[in-house]
């Protein structure tokens, strides 16, 4: 059903690219979302050492691991215009690095008015001015993507300007570019009072809107807010490793199969290396359950 199951490469820390990709394969993964930090350099590097990047590409191929995306996230609403301009320069470098690694997908963050952390909510994110600033910056990123023949992976995230599936659909319509792809993470779409245990419509409606553009499906979980360790005064859910929370993964996997045209890579993240085996087992169990159910339904229809 899903032939590509992988992980954020940063969750597996090893001193060399060869050891990194061997470890990734050893956990049963056949793909990764890569980050330049895995090469011992900044996530937004100042330069591209092609020898180092080619070495990483060879190591991935040797281990049988496909690089399906390269992270290039920075705050598109950075109020420090000098730093923002420099980050666009670094984005262009990463577009080149992605090509060396054999992927055409570079992931971005749509940004926030909160200046200390690009993944933290700010009430100004919903303003028309924030939307204009974000689309202007996104167009600049699209121009870079066009030059280097890569695609931009945008993730709807409650803490950012593109905070839900409707925002993502609006962005695609307004910029009218085939180079926008969606990184789909249902854990990032739930905001109380919507409950991941019962409100599967959040996933279904989002995939009905965006399914044709989904390039990667992220897999983390929503922490049970009733547990003291995850009581959050921000009004948002906290996240845990896949299988340790309350997200209905059976519904998620079945809707991916139903509404996404091709089998997109499932990428685990938001976990420690020690949690990887349990989360991998959990994902395979859900995938096998859905496959068995679908075979049973097919037999009944014959």
Predicted regions and their residues:
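N-terminal pre-domain/capping segments
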Residues: 1-104, 139, 177, 181, ...
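Acidic/histidine-rich catalytic cores of soluble enzymes
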Residues: 3-5, 70, 136-241, 246, ...
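Active-site beta-loop-alpha junctions enriched in small/polar residues
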Residues: 8-12, 35-39, 72-75, 111-113, ...
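Active-site acidic/histidine proton-transfer and metal-coordination neighborhood
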Residues: 18-19, 59-62, 78-184
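Conserved, mostly hydrophobic/aromatic
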Residues: 24, 32, 60, 98, ...
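Alpha-helix N-cap and loop-to-helix initiation/capping positions
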Residues: 44-55, 82-90, 122-133, 159-163, ...
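H/E-rich (His + Asp/Glu) clusters that bind or coordinate divalent metals
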Residues: 234, 241, 250-252, 257-266
């Amino acid at each position: 059903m899903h032939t590509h199951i992988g992980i954020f490469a940063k969750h597996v820390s090893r001193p060399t690219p060869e050891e990194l990709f061997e470890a990734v394969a050893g956990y049963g993964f056949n793909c990764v979302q890569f980050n330049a930090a895995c090469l011992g350099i900044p996530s937004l590097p100042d330069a591209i050492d092609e020898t180092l990047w080619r070495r990483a590409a060879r190591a991935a191929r040797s281990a049988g691991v496909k690089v399906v995306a390269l992270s290039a996230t920075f705050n598109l609403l950075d109020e420090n215009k000098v730093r923002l301009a420099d980050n666009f320069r670094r984005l262009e470098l990463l577009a080149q690095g992605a090509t060396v690694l054999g992927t055409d997908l570079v992931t971005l963050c749509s940004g926030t008015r909160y200046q200390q952390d690009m993944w933290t909510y700010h009430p100004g994110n919903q303003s028309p001015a924030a939307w204009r600033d974000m689309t202007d910056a996104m167009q600049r990123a699209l121009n870079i993507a066009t030059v280097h023949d890569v695609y931009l992976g945008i993730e709807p995230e409650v803490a950012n300007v593109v905070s839900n599936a409707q925002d993502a659909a609006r962005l695609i319509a307004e910029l009218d570019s085939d180079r926008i792809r969606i990184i789909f993470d249902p854990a990032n779409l739930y905001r109380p009072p919507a409950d991941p245990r019962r409100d599967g419509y959040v996933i279904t409606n989002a995939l009905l809107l965006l399914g044709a553009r989904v390039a990667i499906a992220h897999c983390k979980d929503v922490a049970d807010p009733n547990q003291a360790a995850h009581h959050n005064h921000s009004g948002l859910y906290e996240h845990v490793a896949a299988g340790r929370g309350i997200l209905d993964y059976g519904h998620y996997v079945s809707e991916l199969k139903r509404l996404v045209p091709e089998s997109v890579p499932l990428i685990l993240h938001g976990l420690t290396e020690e949690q990887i085996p349990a989360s991998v087992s959990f994902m395979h169990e859900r995938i096998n359950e859905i496959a068995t159910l679908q075979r049973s339904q097919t037999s009944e229809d014959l």
